[in-house]
Swiss-Prot record:
BP term (GO), one: negative regulation of translation
Organism: Desulforamulus reducens (strain ATCC BAA-1160 / DSM 100696 / MI-1)
Cited NCBIfam families: rplM_bact (TIGR01066)
SUPFAM superfamilies in the record: Ribosomal protein L13 (SSF52161)
Listed name of the protein: Large ribosomal subunit protein uL13
Purpose: This protein is one of the early assembly proteins of the 50S ribosomal subunit, although it is not seen to bind rRNA by itself. It is important during the early stages of 50S assembly.
UniProt entry tagged with the keyword Ribosomal protein: yes
Origin superkingdom: Bacteria
Annotated family: Belongs to the universal ribosomal protein uL13 family.
Keywords: Ribonucleoprotein, Ribosomal protein
GO cellular component assignments: cytosolic large ribosomal subunit
InterPro entries assigned: Ribosomal_uL13, Ribosomal_uL13_bac-type, Ribosomal_uL13_CS, Ribosomal_uL13_sf
Gene that encodes it: rplM
Keyword Nucleotide-binding: no
Length: 143
């Protein structure tokens, strides 16, 4: 009888990839980054094991949105107190914290459990084109 291959955490060889978000739609950048973080780009993908690689997203401030989402897309957060709902448009978030927009988009595409939190820790997002991970020799990911 044949059995399905299940990767073990010790078997995983992690790589580093750089994604340049300049001029690319937010959803496409987030989907590719989430795919790499989960490990779905490798043949040894196992759903319950973190088989993903590290991802560095550069130029997060130059990511684009299609349509009227620049003004219509809203981000919300709540303090937990009555009347504590805060809403921010995409435009104001882009002015204040553009890296947070990319992080939230990618985090929403990862599993919502402890494994997803572990995979999210392998994500690094930078506003400019410079990053501090040259020692890891990251490969450029084109899509």
């Amino acid at each position: 009888m044949k059995t399905t291959f299940m990767a073990k955490p010790a078997d995983v060889q992690r790589k580093w990839y750089v994604i340049d978000a300049e001029g690319k739609p937010l959803g496409r950048v987030a989907a590719e980054a989430a795919r790499i973080l989960r490990g779905k780009h490798t043949p040894m993908f196992t759903p319950h094991v973190d088989t993903g690689d590290h991802v560095i997203v550069i130029n997060a401030d130059k990511v684009i949105l299609t349509g009227k989402k620049l003004d219509q897309k809203m981000y919300t957060r709540h303090s937990g107190y009555p009347g504590g709902l805060k809403e921010f448009s995409y435009r104001t978030m882009m002015e204040k914290r553009p890296e947070l927009i990319v992080e939230k988009a990618i985090k929403g595409m990862l599993p919502h459990n402890r494994l997803g939190a572990q995979q999210f820790k392998k994500l690094k997002v930078y506003v400019g084109s410079e990053h501090s991970h040259e020692a890891q020799k990251p490969e450029v990911w084109n899509f």
